[in-house]
From Swiss-Prot:
This is Large ribosomal subunit protein uL29. PANTHER family: 60S RIBOSOMAL PROTEIN L35/50S RIBOSOMAL PROTEIN L29, LARGE RIBOSOMAL SUBUNIT PROTEIN UL29C. GO terms for cellular component: cytosolic large ribosomal subunit. Keywords: Ribonucleoprotein, Ribosomal protein. It comes from the Bacteria.
């Protein structure tokens, strides 16, 4: 998900998405360990999405207005 899309979300929505992505990341890692993962690049995408959302949450916490 793009940062511009995430910036339009509320803080509660972002926290919810981070939770969903963490759960998905757990499942992807489990699939990787058992050899069932079809698209290993998805792990990277999910990790980056979590990082983007956490960055936006931190910016809001500090009162930084980027973008």
């Amino acid at each position: 998900m793009k940062a511009t899309d995430l910036r339009q979300s509320t803080t509660e929505e972002l926290n919810g998405k981070v939770g969903e992505w963490k759960e998905e990341l757990f499942n992807l890692r489990f699939q990787l360990a058992t050899g069932q993962l079809e698209n290993p690049a998805r792990i990277r995408e999910v990790r980056k999405s979590i990082a983007r959302a956490k960055t936006i949450l931190r910016e809001r916490e500090l009162g930084i207005n980027n973008g």
